[in-house]
């Protein structure tokens, strides 16, 4: 099996087209039952690209932390979120796009081209964009965005676990693991659970149906 690593090909192509501020965008947290969805936008600079960038899911937690710290030092970085309330009101896809737009808007330089992980370009970003399927494994700027977004969201979930112990958010990051689902049954949902997601909705419906 051929092992692929992200490279600078997509950034080079955009720069060759005349764009001058090319950034990578990725999000993390679409699937969890709890917590926000988090997006990051990163502008890397040739000659200052950290070694070992890759899809955040392929890296250990320690390696992600180390790379995130380096990325914040050598690159322009913006991190943004869409809240649980926004996820429930809009749906997870639209909330993810909202977080991406906020991340782009938060960069110190105004991007003129965005490389976005996935198969869909969010509407209304106000930037020229290109969607790249599996971009976090192919494009260095998107890989960097995936790392800082993952680290930022994991820290949020660790903080939330201090407020709501018992759900295992430090380790499961809000995903629907067996232990998390059991805790939902035993403890009930918190304000940080996504009511629009089926496992949480079903538990709330059960609670409502047995209430006097």
Curated annotation (Swiss-Prot):
InterPro entries tied to this protein: RNase_HII, RNase_HII/HIII, RNase_HII/HIII_dom, RNaseH-like_sf, RNaseH_sf
Co-factor remark: Manganese or magnesium. Binds 1 divalent metal ion per monomer in the absence of substrate. May bind a second metal ion after substrate binding.
Name by which UniProt lists this protein: Ribonuclease HII
Main location: cytoplasm
Reactions mediated catalytically: Endonucleolytic cleavage to 5'-phosphomonoester
Binding site for a divalent metal cation: 26-27, 117
UniProt record similarity statement: Belongs to the RNase HII family.
The gene coding this protein: rnhB
Entry's Gene Ontology molecular function annotations: manganese ion binding; RNA binding; RNA-DNA hybrid ribonuclease activity
Pfam families from the UniProt entry: RNase_HII
Lineage: Bacteria, Pseudomonadati, Pseudomonadota, Alphaproteobacteria, Rhodobacterales
Residue ranges of every copy of the RNase H type-2 domain listed in the record: 20-209
Gene3D superfamilies with a match to the protein in the record: Ribonuclease H-like superfamily/Ribonuclease H (3.30.420.10)
Swiss-Prot/TrEMBL cofactor(s): Mn(2+); Mg(2+)
Listed SUPFAM superfamilies: Ribonuclease H-like
Function: Endonuclease that specifically degrades the RNA of RNA-DNA hybrids.
UniProt keyword annotations, A-Z: Cytoplasm, Endonuclease, Hydrolase, Manganese, Metal-binding, Nuclease
One GO CC annotation: cytoplasm
Enzyme Commission numbers on file: 3.1.26.4
PANTHER family: RIBONUCLEASE H2 SUBUNIT A, RIBONUCLEASE HII
Compartments, as annotated in UniProt: Cytoplasm
GO biological process: DNA replication, removal of RNA primer; mismatch repair
């Amino acid at each position: 099996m051929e092992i692929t690593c992200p490279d600078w090909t997509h950034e080079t192509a955009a720069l060759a087209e005349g764009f001058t501020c090319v950034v990578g965008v990725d999000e993390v947290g679409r699937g969890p039952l709890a917590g926000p969805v988090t997006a990051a936008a990163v502008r890397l600079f040739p000659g200052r690209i950290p070694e070992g960038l890759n899809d955040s899911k392929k890296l250990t937690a320690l390696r992600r932390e180390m790379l995130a710290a380096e990325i914040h030092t050598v690159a322009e970085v913006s991190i943004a979120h869409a809240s649980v309330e926004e996820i429930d009101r809009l749906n997870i896809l639209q909330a993810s796009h909202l977080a991406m737009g906020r991340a782009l808007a938060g960069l110190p330089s105004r991007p003129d081209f965005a490389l976005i992980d996935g198969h869909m370009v969010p509407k209304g970003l106000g930037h020229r964009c290109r969607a790249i399927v599996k971009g976090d494994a192919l494009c260095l700027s998107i890989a960097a965005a995936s790392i800082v977004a993952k680290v930022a969201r994991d820290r949020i979930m660790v903080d939330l676990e201090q407020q709501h112990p018992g759900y295992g958010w430090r380790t499961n990051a809000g995903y629907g693991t067996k232990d998390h689902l059991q805790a939902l049954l035993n403890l009930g949902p918190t304000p940080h659970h996504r009511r629009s997601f089926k496992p949480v909705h079903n538990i709330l419906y059960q609670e409502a149906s047995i209430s006097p």
